[in-house]
């Protein structure tokens, strides 16, 4: 079943009006007709099962059949801080991170980042990454569309992470799987967790020291060296499994929204 997102202001009682590119996609690409069914999420934790009523000018009119609290969000907010990779790797990282439950994605320039983006290029990249995040959220039936932040410096990213409950830094020189297991096991539902991933070439040692001074916890992901596009997704997968296994009902927690 097709899944779309609508701003809460588009929800009016038993009716939802979609606008923008989604209308063209529904009407001209999917060729959805009155009576066909779709899921709509408001980005704030509510899902709506709807029936297409028809199209009016530049809007798709949907009738709400039932609504329920989204059950697809993790019980903790996972924020992926991704060192800028080369080429189009960031697009793939954004897509998969959203599928794995990332709440927000923060790209940053590290000392070993090869890619250098000026303000104009960074803005265009972010728009592209945000569009990919929206598509991935629709495909994976997320209750929110994770935000992709503006590109930051490493220092700005560390300052941003100061408000989080836990900050993890997978590092190839870190040892001790038992220590990593102990750190992961202590993460509680409702906590916010940052994951810092270096670019190709990893982190500079000075960045690791800076992260530790700020309270970040270096962890290991095993004996193998992972690519930058693999390390973050591996960490997200581990955390997703840990949180899902805790079997804590998401409805018992305050619903996170990306408006905060």
Where are these regions (language model features)?
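Active-site/ligand-binding-proximal alpha/beta "capping" segment
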Residues: 169-197, 201-202, 217-219
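C-terminal helical cap(s) of enzyme catalytic domains, especially alpha/beta-barrels
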Residues: 232-236, 240
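C-terminal functional extensions of proteins
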Residues: 241-249
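RNA substrate-binding interface of SAM-dependent RNA methyltransferases
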Residues: 71-168
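Conserved small/polar residues in nucleotide/adenosyl-binding loops
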Residues: 251-260
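N-terminal positively charged helical leader segments and presequences
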Residues: 1-69
């Amino acid at each position: 079943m097709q899944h779309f997102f609508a701003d809460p202001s588009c929800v009016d009682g038993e009716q939802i009006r979609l606008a923008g590119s989604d209308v063209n996609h529904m009407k001209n690409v999917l060729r959805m007709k009155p009576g066909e069914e779709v899921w709509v999420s408001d980005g704030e934790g509510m899902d709506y099962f709807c029936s297409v009523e028809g199209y009016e000018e530049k809007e798709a009119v949907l009738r709400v059949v039932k609504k329920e609290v989204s059950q697809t969000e993790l019980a903790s907010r996972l924020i992926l801080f991704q060192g800028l990779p080369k080429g189009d790797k960031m697009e793939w990282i954004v897509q998969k991170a959203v599928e794995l439950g990332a709440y927000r994605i923060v790209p940053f320039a590290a000392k070993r980042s090869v890619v250098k983006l000026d303000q104009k290029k960074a803005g265009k990249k972010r728009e592209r990454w945000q569009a990919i995040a929206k598509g991935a959220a629709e495909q994976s039936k997320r209750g929110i569309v994770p935000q992709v932040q503006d590109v930051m410096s490493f220092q700005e990213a560390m300052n941003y992470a100061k408000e989080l409950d836990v900050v993890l830094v997978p590092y190839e020189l870190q040892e001790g799987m038992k220590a990593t297991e102990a750190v992961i096991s202590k993460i509680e539902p409702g906590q916010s967790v940052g994951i810092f991933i270096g670019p190709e070439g990893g982190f500079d040692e000075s960045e690791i020291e800076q992260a530790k001074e700020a309270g970040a916890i270096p962890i290991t992901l095993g004996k193998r060296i992972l690519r930058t596009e693999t390390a973050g997704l591996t960490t997200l997968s581990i955390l997703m499994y840990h949180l899902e296994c805790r079997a804590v009902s998401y409805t018992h927690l305050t619903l996170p929204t990306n408006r905060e």
